[in-house]
Amino acid sequence: MKKFDAPSVRELLDTGAEKFGDATFIKFIRDGKIEERSFKKVRSDSLAVCRWIRSLSDKRMHIAIIGKSNYEYITCLSGILISGNVAVPFAPDISVEEAAELFKRADIEMLLYEDEFAENAEKLKELCPFLRFSVNLGNGEEFEKIYTDYSENSEYASLSDITVDKNACCVIIFTSGTTGIKKGVELSTLALVGNIMYHDYCTDIFLPNDVSLSVLPMYHIYCFSGDYIKNLKDGLQVCLNGSMMDLIKNLKIFEPKVVRVVPMIAQSLLQRVKAILAKDPETSVKDAVAQVFGRNIKWLISGGAYLNPELVDEYEKLGIFLRQGYGMTEAGCRISVPDNTASRESVGRVTDVCTVRIQNGEIQVNTPTVMLGYYKMPEETKEMFTEDGWLKTGDIGELTEDNQLFITGRVKNLIILSNGENVSPEAIEKKFADNQLVSEVLVYGEKDRIIAEIYPDYEYAKLEGIDDIQGELEKAVDRMNKTAKAAHIISEVRVRTEPLEKTGSGKIKRKATVL
């Protein structure tokens, strides 16, 4: 069998500069003006950052980077990756206490941060005496100086003449930690870049010079891998959205063809289109879409959470393909990717970089882009793999003969009834997706009974004149129960006055089954 290989980030930058040259790669708004950076310029500035870092220390360092997705963030992340050091990205809203703990666990020696984190960065210097370097990313003038002083024409030019071991760790990404302590996923260059070297089932999504709007944070592998690494390979323009408050404005300014989203964003944008059509019935669907998305939108690629198939249908009525993929950081990112010929209820088709099997209902993955492990957590790493080396995703699913993947729940969330039957709470929760009275729902087991805890959409109830919310929800559940499997029958509806408790990443916290 041919050994799996993939280019390094440096090789991607070199190829991009050679192939696409002065074509625009990165666009962003600064001080009210649109600025552009070509493939050549991004390569040049990334190499300058690489030389700057190596001029500070020839020792391999773990470098934390805290900030929003701006141009300096991207060149720093690239510079770290091509310098042979290890990038460790964090969310900009991380607390000082958590950052100090994770810095210690991840052996951080250098911190790059944006202006908004400056005060906390000073506190971290006191809490983390092992930090050797700390640099503010928000200082544009400082970075322009780095780009110039460490250019290919400078005395430091030779510092970028290095060969990176593609099998060594290049990035550590901490998982959200919905259960227990956060774990640092170690990925190699081979995993990071190799994961995007798959065959696109939809050949018209990623074409050179197409415009992609990047709205999700770069510290998530879904965004960095898709909006940066893959678009660098394919020659797309990447427009940086910045704040979510600017999304609607920037959609109309940049007029993208493709946007990577989470389902919540897709739902919100759809509601805007519907509001325009409701306000003026004379407005055409095409014009309403253009008022929200601009004139070129064709694709929304969803990930990170369950996507209601009804939402897919709604978007197709607008002439937009909304499709989802599936992945996890531990697999290098993608496991399956969008395909507009696949079932709307699937998460696309498994990539040709991955092999998937279903063992006892669980989706398990074999891929050369799998993680090296959890940093300094050998026992936790071992638990993630089967005896024959397959990655355990923890998701329950089905795989068809034509490689379509379907997810039905989580292994850890299974409700095990006294008769031994396993019930996926997610499968029941999905049945509430079309009920406008339901804002949030959590299904769990309690003494061999299925409970549905619901936070209603009180605004909707008010508009529709629904006074007996409990009664209305019980009627809806009765209708569901008539066609449900015996094990899926909901015994009780509990109505909440407050939203369900969430994790740091915005996911609903699960309750343990009470036996």
Which stretches of residues belong to each language-model region?
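Conserved ATP-binding/catalytic segment of the ANL
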Residues: 350, 357-358, 362-417, 422, ...
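Gly/Ser/Thr-rich phosphate-binding loop
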Residues: 257-261, 269-342, 439
